[in-house]
Swiss-Prot record:
Lineage: Eukaryota, Fungi, Dikarya, Ascomycota, Taphrinomycotina
Biological source species: Schizosaccharomyces pombe (strain 972 / ATCC 24843)
PROSITE patterns per record: GLNA_1, GLNA_ATP, GS_BETA_GRASP, GS_CATALYTIC
SMART domains given in the database record: Gln-synt_C
Listed InterPro entries: Gln_synt_N, Gln_synt_N_sf, Gln_synth/guanido_kin_cat_dom, Gln_synth_cat_dom, Gln_synth_gly_rich_site, Gln_synth_N_conserv_site, Glutamine_Synthetase
The name this protein goes by in its record: Glutamine synthetase
One Pfam family this sequence matches: Gln-synt_C
Known EC number: 6.3.1.2
GO terms classed as biological process: ammonia assimilation cycle; glutamine biosynthetic process
Length: 359
């Protein structure tokens, strides 16, 4: 039997609802979520006697790191340290979602834990009052890894009608997008908007503004919610920066940045000084801005070239865009358009902070 003989097994929501409202006899379900060795997410659940009032009341747990690409089989126990807590939109009630960071037995960060170093760097420069906002683009795929809603054996019409589209044939799977929006709000994610993207079956949502380490924490949790909701519809979520080769837009994680200085009167000068530093460290940034980003940063489809740093006002073909409103007001924020949709936000917010304040 090939994979093409298998149909996706959809969630049976109506049946599940018979059990979802059963009383839990005072117990609380806490789902621990972590980043694995493949830039994806894993989770497992434990039962608590009561809802914790702070993250410090949650215990350190562990998992088999050899099964997630994070540890060898002869020393596989990897520690899960809770770092952020959210309302659970799936189980509701007092149940919670717990974002956890991975550590080795000696207490040092696991090799795939980029949060630890990022948190220290952001805390070091907390006086700069840096705010981040990330635009997460993603592509919906069907069970056979074909963009969801695309014609079988063919392609949709050229790009044009799909960006912020309305109507059948112009947008696909809006119900997943709406469900994710509501779930993020319920969970406590600072989701600030959604829109259909240029390529059909591609969407975007925005998280932020967030200060400090919350940017990375909230983006990862929002991705978890998206994957879980898509499960119910038998749809896969791809964060690949160029899921379909050819004359189609790629997917990015445009990262918006402002500091106390850029938001102040005359802050455009601070923005320009930061971008001069960015130009000198372009290669270092590209190195952590996502795998396969060379397929996306071609200078076409609203991207700059991966080989050259540029910036400009209202220029979506530049590495960094200064919004028209910022140029007119003389202060505000800038948008780094280089990060791919698959980024680890801890690496991206970390290197941006490092470049602005330590170079």
């Amino acid at each position: 039997m090939s994979q093409y003989d298998v149909e996706p097994l959809l969630s049976k929501a109506a049946i599940l609802n018979k059990y979802a409202d059963l009383p839990q006899n005072g117990k609380v379900m806490a789902e621990y979520i972590w980043i694995d060795g493949f830039n994806h997410l894993r989770s497992k659940t434990m039962t608590l006697d009561a809802k914790p009032s702070s993250i410090d009341q949650l215990r350190v747990w562990n998992f088999d790191g050899s099964s997630t690409g994070q540890a060898p089989g002869n020393n596989s126990d990897t520690l899960l340290k809770p770092v952020a807590m959210y309302n659970d939109p799936f189980r509701r009630g007092d149940n919670i979602l717990v974002l956890a960071a991975c550590y080795t037995a000696d207490g040092s960060p696991n090799g795939f834990n980029h949060r630890d170093a990022c948190a220290k760097l952001l805390e070091k420069h907390a006086d700069k009052e840096t705010w981040f906002g990330i635009e997460q683009e993603y592509t919906m795929l069907d069970y056979y890894d074909r963009p969801f809603g695309w014609p079988k054996g063919g392609f949709p019409g050229p790009q044009g009608p799909f960006y912020c589209g309305v109507g059948t044939g112009r947008v696909f799977a809006r119900d997943i997008v709406e469900a994710h929006y509501k779930a993020c709000l319920y969970a406590g994610i600072n989701i600030s908007g959604i829109n259909a993207e240029v390529m059909p079956s591609q969407w975007e949502y925005q998280v932020g503004p967030c200060a400090g380490i919350e940017m990375g924490d909230q983006l990862w949790m929002s991705r978890f919610l998206l994957h879980r909701i898509a499960e119910d519809f038998g749809v896969k979520i791809s964060f690949h920066p160029k899921p379909i080769l050819g004359d189609w837009n790629g997917a990015g994680c445009h990262t918006n940045v402002s500091t106390k200085d850029t938001r102040a009167e005359g802050g455009i000068k601070a923005i320009e000084s930061y971008l001069e530093k960015f130009a000198k460290r372009h290669k270092e940034h590209i190195a952590v801005y996502g795998d396969d980003n060379d397929l996306r940063l071609t200078g076409r489809h609203e991207t700059g070239s991966i080989d050259k740093f540029t910036y400009g006002v209202a220029d979506r073909g530049a590495s960094v865009r200064i919004p028209r409103s910022v140029a007119m007001n003389g202060c505000g924020y800038f948008e780094d358009r280089r990060p791919a949709s698959s980024i680890d936000p801890y690496l991206v917010t970390g290197i941006i902070t490092e470049t602005m304040f330590e170079h």
